[in-house]
């Protein structure tokens, strides 16, 4: 009999969506909270297959001691872009995402959110939108 704890199951789900965001590693909010000496970027608020409760997911960017000024500035701009996105402030989110892309043109995350902004402009999510991205596959 194979027993898979909730933590192992979540880890497996996160591994499955990591490549969709174009990042090397994703961790849960709990892991990011417990890790010391690492700078994390919040990536998204997701509901993975088999879980009812959405979770925030993070990407480790650098050791705190090695994070340079550009990384920290980009992180701050990303946090502002994510806040604007979640507040359905599409123009501001787009402006900030384009600013991020100017510095890091190959970061897929920015393209993903620019596409979401474009999609939500055409088909707004509504006032009760919680910002959660649902993943139905493993």
Q: What are the language-model segments listed below?
A:
Residues 1-2:
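Short, small-residue-biased leader/transition segments that mark boundaries at the very start
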Residues 126-138:
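Intrinsically disordered, low-complexity, charge-biased linker/tail regions
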């Amino acid at each position: 009999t194979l027993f898979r704890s909730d933590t192992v199951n979540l880890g497996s789900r996160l591994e499955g969506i990591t490549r969709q965001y174009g990042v090397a590693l994703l961790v849960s909010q709990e892991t990011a909270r417990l890790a010391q000496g690492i700078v994390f970027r919040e990536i998204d608020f997701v509901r993975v297959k088999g879980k009812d409760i959405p979770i925030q997911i993070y990407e480790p960017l650098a050791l705190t001691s090695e994070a340079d000024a550009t990384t920290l500035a980009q992180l701050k701009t990303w946090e502002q872009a994510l806040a604007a996105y979640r507040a359905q402030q599409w123009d501001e989110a787009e402006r900030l995402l384009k600013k991020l892309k100017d510095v890091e043109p190959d970061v897929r995350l920015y393209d993903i959110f620019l596409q979401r902004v474009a999609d939500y402009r055409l088909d707004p999510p509504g006032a009760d939108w919680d910002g959660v991205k649902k993943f139905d596959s493993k």
